[in-house]
Amino acid sequence: GEAYPYVDVGVSPAPASRDLPIWVGGSGAAAWRRTGRRGDGYIPMGATRDQYPEIIATIRRAAEEAGRGGVGFDIGIMPGWAYIGEPPEDLPPAWLTGPPEKIAEELRADRAVGANAFHLKFRARTIEEYLDQLAAFGEQVRPLL
């Protein structure tokens, strides 16, 4: 597409690699086709698991039509807020809560329909609680995946 020059603009921290993947986010067939034509990955917004086969097929078809057949791409899942364990009552609701086994089961179900990347956001009231949630994911959920 068109490019626009900017003066005295920077991005920090600088990317670790010059080969940056293009992730497309959105909902609907137009976003799926755009991913096939230009993207390296897709994050569906509000898609359900039963939509993933159609999403993946549409991306592959658009990639073929754009001469990008055989190019790999990632499909993500963004399930929303998570809390490992029983969330405190004063915490805003989270979509994915419960013991590590339940969270791993949900993420495995996403993988079974084609998602190979996920974006989880953890609910927490303090930075310490947030860091505890990250540690719990790494130590208790990740080994189950």
Segments and roles (model prediction):
Residues 1-145:
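Active-site-adjacent structural elements that line small-molecule/cofactor binding pockets in enzymes
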